Swiss-Prot record:
SUPFAM superfamilies: Immunoglobulin
Domain Ig-like: 20-117
Function: V region of the variable domain of immunoglobulin heavy chains that participates in the antigen recognition. Immunoglobulins, also known as antibodies, are membrane-bound or secreted glycoproteins produced by B lymphocytes. In the recognition phase of humoral immunity, the membrane-bound immunoglobulins serve as receptors which, upon binding of a specific antigen, trigger the clonal expansion and differentiation of B lymphocytes into immunoglobulins-secreting plasma cells.
Name of the protein: Immunoglobulin heavy variable 3-30-3
The organism of origin for this protein: Homo sapiens (Human)
Signal peptide (from-to): 1-19
Amino acid sequence: MEFGLSWVFLVALLRGVQCQVQLVESGGGVVQPGRSLRLSCAASGFTFSSYAMHWVRQAPGKGLEWVAVISYDGSNKYYADSVKGRFTISRDNSKNTLYLQMNSLRAEDTAVYYCAR
């Protein structure tokens, strides 16, 4: 019984640590093809300026697709071929926020977008 209580406590402790990292996306919407949208991702619970950050997306009925990555200081950016020249990833380390500017949107860009560390 003593072992069981210790195990439950350990699980609760680990879950608490995981919950300290928060990434909250905003800015999505429904737009016509050819229009623009800007997504934001507010980060907390870790030193944002120390990490490269990614955007990934999941289209309806499909798997996850990597979209873009930006280095910790914003000096390097890489994009999936499907969005290159249309999407721009950026960050503001003073605001702990990641951005994705999406221009010339297409029907195939329809997806749930996630930021990831």
